[in-house]
Amino acid sequence: MYKEATGEEAIISQRDVDQFNYGIEPLARYGKLGALLAQFPPSFKKNDGYAQQILSAVIRTFGQYRLAVELRHRSWSDGENTARFLKDNNISWVHIDEPKFQSSVAAEVPLTSNMAYFRFHGRNKEMWWKGDSETRYKYLYSPEEINELANRVKVASDKAQLLFAFFNNHWQGYAPRNAVSIMRTLQLPFRELPIQQPLPDEDVPES
C-alpha cells in the first residue's frame, strides 16, 4: 500500500484513494491481486490515539480487498484487544521475522483471519537501526533458521485457507535463495532459479 496512508504522518485523502484503486483495479478484476499489505513503521504505537484512528481508517477505506496489516511496535501485541479488533474486521495480522528489541512486536501473533501472511526481514541486528535500506536487510537465513521458519509456516497453513510468505532480505539476491530453500523444506513445487547465460560476444572466463 502507498506510504502516505501508513507512513510516519499518514494522511488518507479521497484523491489518493481513488488513484490507488484505479491503479490496482485491473489486478483485482482478473483475480491477480492476492492481498494488500499495510505496513506501519515501528513508531506506530497502539497507545497513540491517532494511530488507532489511522488503522481504523485504513481498514474502513480498503476493506473491500483482502488486507494484511504489519504492526511492528510491541504495544500492539501487548494490548488485549488488538487480535479481537482484527478478527472482527477479518484482517490478517502479519507474522514478522526480524531482529528483536525491547520495542519489537511479539515474534508470534495470533491468526486473525482465514489468511496467514508472513514477512521475513532477516535478523541483521547490528545494522537494523543504523543501516540503510540495503544493508539493513543484508542477512542470509541459515538452514537451521529456514527449518524454524518452515515450521511456523506449516503450523499456520493447517489453520488458514490462504497463506503468503515473503522474504524481504533482498541484499544481493538473498531473498530468492532463501525462498527456494524454504520451498524445498516444505516440499513445495517451484521453478529453478534461472542461470545467467553469457551473450554471444561475451568473454567467458576459463575454469
Give the location of each predicted region.
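Residues lining hydrophobic/aromatic ligand-binding pockets adjacent to catalytic sites
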Residues: 1-207
